[in-house]
């Protein structure tokens, strides 16, 4: 986030908000949460916002709660197919809920918790610059000819070690299917693995749009933001959600699209065995691959950011 915001006219403020987890943080929560609320109060008094936009997460709770006490309207945004704990708590204090995935479970929970809340299916905002890439740019970055299918494994800036290990363990089989682009995550490259048709990089920012445009099949985690961007791209996609014990919402995000036959979903515990066969099936024909991408594209909401911005502006003017 820090790298993404660098150079943009957005003021970033840190707040020491506690997480409601186990261990020492749970013991200290009764002490730390009031301090976080006091910190939030000072920030809100200084900035005097007309409206507060909360995306969920532990940082949003003290700010939104104090904002409600100060009679500032709270607008929530829920990215995922199931509502997070912070947003569930903040519903009763909020005026408007924007939902990224139009799931009945999210809507019903909002209605049951707060009968006065207004609900709008806005979609999830995307980085529109990701849609500006080209095949020529991808060829330039990777050195690939583009004559073979392009397989992209994209674990995000933090990387996904399970994805990395599966790629390294089945690289020979993947290279039988096409050229492989592997974004490992910061500091997770294996520099001793080299091949003319294997492009390995930890993180790409400026050139990421070209890599995405160049890819025929993309393998990714199932975070809501990634899914929104992949839907906008309309690429054939394989999702590998985090296990339920880590993040249940990724499983739900992926399941929602799997039911619609818009993505292929693989379990990370058996990824080494299933990754290559899944990609082989997608690449079985151009029609098969394109239809999968087209079905995912039907879930794209390219103007999600504008929809949310309009709600914020309308609320602020009231």
Model-derived features: positions:
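Conserved nucleotide-sugar phosphate-binding/catalytic loop shared by glycosyltransferases and other
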Residues: 1-32, 39, 121-124, 267-269
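A short, well-ordered alpha-helix in the C-terminal region of glycosyltransferases
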Residues: 288-302
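Structural loop-to-beta junction motif characteristic of Rossmann-like glycosyltransferase folds
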Residues: 10, 72-73, 216-217, 234-242, ...
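C-terminal alpha-helical cap of glycosyltransferases
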Residues: 301-318
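Active-site-proximal region of nucleotide-activated glycan assembly enzymes
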Residues: 11, 68-136
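Donor-nucleotide binding loops and adjacent catalytic segments primarily
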Residues: 2, 7-8, 135-220, 250-254, ...
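Glycosyltransferases and closely related glycan-assembly transferases
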Residues: 4, 38-53, 59-75, 88-96
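Acidic donor-binding loop of glycosyltransferase active sites
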Residues: 50-51, 213-228, 235-236
